[in-house]
């Protein structure tokens, strides 16, 4: 049910841009939300705090869970006003409302060097396959009975059902995500994962439909720490871009305890600032998705000078879209049975929405169609998937191309396969992280068209959820080859040997799009120079003209090495002060400072990025960097959605505050008269991140269309979003 509701966020929400009608004055608030009960995570300043004494003043608050490994804190439940008061207690470091997390190889394993590295041996003369390395997976569970996973699975726990059986959800709201992730890491049968002999420990923190709470994910991290896993994979996340959320902090702690943590960067790209927690963790390895070079299908229409090629994206799990496929195209509206009466032996063009992809494909097949093209109901392209293979091929295309096809009504379309180079996937979330401007992702790996294990067999899926386990498998191989390596050394080896990718215009992607580039495992295993950190952020907190960043360089080789930083290319208004060349003896390390001076009069924007080059003899090593001259102008409020709630006649909303707000509110105005109708919600000192609430029907205005003014105030600045929402309590 939870997954269905999350999906419905985009299916049933009726949100339209509404033209501004002059300045709207928001009336003062009458307090009415303080009694709402919420769940939150409270972190303590000191380890010796008496938890019972802290909560004595707040009788409505009760302890739900105690965290002592991943975090020093508790999860609590109680009235919002008491939780707000608790934030002021000197013994409390932070209080964060619990949010929802969503579970967001055949050719990809050799592509990243997985096959090549199996030809190498460790000091025990063992082939590099991940043998003896414990990999934890926090996800929807695992089908440990799958023939390709039986040998790899060693144990785990079901946090959702509180037992030692982390099997995937079956029946209604069934899941497959965790099994797919596990196969990429360590399948050992018909398919072979990156590290086929690694030991898999599965922690089921995401329940039916593939969603779970902060609390359950934290419990899973605690268990993984207790089980002393070597590598921990989290192919999950939410849309909260902040470095200090509980899950991100817990991963930082796990890394400090010696666990190499890997997190997916999110599937909300291609815009900046779309990375979500736990991909925002400072010390974990955050992974974006690339599309390996391949021949990809395009449909062509027209003749001569009017000929046009349109990229299409085969739907994962559907019957393959074959090369040189052609046929007559007809408009099938949204794909309902009554709209497909002329579909026999035709390719049907249908619009996304109202019914599922599987239903559209099944309806077209029943009507005798030869294939289905589903175009987006908003701008841009998208990737789709179905869990049951249909009878006919199906693919997606962008909203713009779909509308154009519908308008021009071409008689025939033809399919051609075009070779495309390796690119960053459009859906892959971009950084940087708000607040600290850290570069994310750290690295990218294949995440498009990844075939792996699922409970019913095998399925090809897309997502950074598929990219992250490539890196987790790579970490397992590196740990087997070099068991003495720390998580920081594993991260450095992967990042300093990554290959930098270029876009279709042959320009290098920004560092906040690709991090250090795409992983090259066969190079990473040979690394013996390490950099801490492996990317640099220069932040101007006090409007200084000179910014600095520190870095430690370590030579773990058996001989002395000479290093030299090269000067970056000319940048107007920027002067770099690089360290002098230096030599490190074997097993020696050195701390360095890099400075840059800037003239704001010659700089047009607030964020700049690039790569520093270090020469180790004749070998080039690249370090991503980013500097912020002023606080970037990211939106103070974003991501507003308004949808039906969990209970009948209730509604729920969500919005995102990148930096928190001194005041946040949602004011409603009648659409026709623009008369003030009341506040949908209001909050003082709202925390940074995602806010999601259900509004009871008695708190809602009468049925009708309303203009919603969503605003956030902070440090004398106010940002607003204006949307039209529809309330219908009769549904």
Spans of features found by a protein language model:
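N-terminal domain-start motif of subtilase-like serine proteases
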Residues: 21-34, 63-66, 77-85, 103-137, ...
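Flexible, small-residue-rich helix->loop connector segments that border functional cores
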Residues: 117, 125, 138-148, 172, ...
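Subtilisin-like peptidase catalytic core
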Residues: 162-240, 288-293, 336, 346-357
């Amino acid at each position: 049910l939870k997954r269905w509701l999350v999906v419905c966020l985009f299916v049933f929400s009726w949100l339209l841009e509404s033209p501004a009608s002059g300045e709207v004055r928001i009336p003062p608030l009458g307090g009415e939300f303080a009694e709402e009960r919420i769940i939150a995570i409270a972190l303590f300043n000191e380890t010796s705090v008496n938890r019972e004494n802290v909560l004595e003043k707040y009788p409505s608050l009760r302890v739900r869970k105690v965290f002592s490994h991943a975090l020093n804190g508790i999860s609590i439940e109680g009235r919002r006003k008491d939780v707000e008061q608790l934030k002021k207690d000197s013994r409390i470091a932070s209080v964060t409302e619990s949010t929802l997390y969503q579970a967001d190889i055949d050719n990809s394993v050799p592509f990243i060097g997985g096959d090549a590295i199996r030809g190498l041996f460790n000091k025990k003369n063992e082939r590099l396959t991940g043998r003896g390395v414990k990999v934890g997976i926090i996800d929807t569970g695992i089908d440990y009975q799958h023939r390709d996973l039986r040998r790899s699975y060693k144990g785990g726990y079901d946090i959702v059902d509180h037992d030692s059986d982390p099997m995937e959800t079956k029946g209604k709201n069934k899941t497959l995500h965790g099994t797919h992730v596990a196969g990429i890491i360590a399948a050992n049968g018909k398919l072979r994962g990156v590290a086929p002999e690694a030991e898999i420990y599965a922690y089921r923190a995401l329940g039916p439909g593939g969603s779970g709470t902060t609390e359950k994910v934290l419990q899973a991290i605690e268990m993984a720490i207790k089980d002393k896993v070597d590598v921990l994979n989290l192919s999950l996340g939410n849309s909260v871009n902040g470095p200090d959320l509980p899950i991100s902090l817990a991963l930082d702690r796990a890394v400090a305890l010696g666990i190499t943590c890997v997190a997916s960067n999110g599937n909300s790209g291609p815009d900046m600032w779309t990375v979500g927690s736990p991909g925002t963790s400072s010390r974990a390895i955050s992974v974006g998705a690339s599309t390996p070079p391949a021949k990809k299908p395009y449909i062509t229409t027209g003749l001569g000078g009017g000929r046009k090629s349109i990229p299409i994206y085969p739907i994962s799990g559907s019957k393959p879209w074959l090369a040189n496929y052609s046929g007559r195209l007809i408009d099938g509206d949204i794909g309902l049975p009554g709209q497909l009466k002329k579909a026999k032996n035709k390719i049907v063009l249908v619009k996304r929405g109202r019914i599922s992809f599987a239903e559209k494909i099944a309806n077209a097949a029943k009507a005798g169609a030869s294939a289905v093209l589903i175009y987006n109901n908003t701008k841009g392209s998208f990737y789709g998937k179905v869990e049951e293979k249909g009878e006919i091929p199906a693919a997606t295309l962008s909203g713009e191309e779909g509308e154009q096809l519908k308008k021009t009504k071409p008689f025939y379309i033809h399919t051609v396969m075009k070779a495309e180079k390796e690119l960053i996937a459009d859906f892959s979330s971009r950084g940087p992280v708000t607040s600290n401007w850290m570069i994310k992702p750290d690295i990218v790996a294949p995440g498009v068209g990844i075939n792996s294990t699922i409970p019913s067999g095998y399925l090809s899926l897309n997502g950074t959820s598929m990219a992250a386990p490539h890196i987790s498998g790579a970490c397992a191989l590196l740990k087997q080859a070099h068991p003495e390596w720390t998580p920081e050394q594993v991260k450095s080896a992967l990042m300093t040997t990554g290959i930098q990718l270029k876009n279709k215009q042959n320009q290098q992607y920004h560092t906040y799009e690709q991090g250090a580039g795409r992983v090259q495992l066969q190079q990473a295993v040979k690394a013996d120079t390490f950099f801490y950190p492996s990317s640099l952020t220069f932040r101007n907190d006090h409007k200084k003209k000179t910014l600095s960043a520190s870095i430690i360089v370590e030579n773990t080789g058996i001989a002395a090495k000479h290093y030299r930083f090269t000067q970056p290319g000319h940048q107007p208004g920027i002067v770099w002060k690089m360290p002098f060349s230096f030599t490190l003896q074997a097993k020696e390390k050195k701390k360095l400072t890099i400075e840059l001076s800037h003239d704001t009069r010659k700089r047009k924007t607030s964020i700049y990025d690039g790569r520093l080059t270090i020469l180790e003899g004749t070998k080039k090593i690249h370090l991503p960097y980013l500097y912020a001259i002023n606080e970037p102008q990211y939106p103070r409020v974003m991501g507003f959605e308004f949808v039906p709630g969990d209970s009948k006649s209730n509604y729920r909303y969500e919005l995102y505050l990148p930096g928190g707000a001194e005041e946040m509110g949602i004011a409603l105005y009648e659409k026709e008269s623009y008369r003030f109708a009341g506040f949908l919600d209001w909050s003082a000192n709202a925390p940074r991140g995602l806010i999601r609430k259900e509004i009871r029907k008695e708190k809602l205005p009468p049925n009708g269309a309303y203009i919603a003014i969503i605003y956030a105030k902070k440090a004398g600045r106010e940002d607003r979003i204006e949307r039209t929402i529809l309330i219908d309590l009769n549904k």
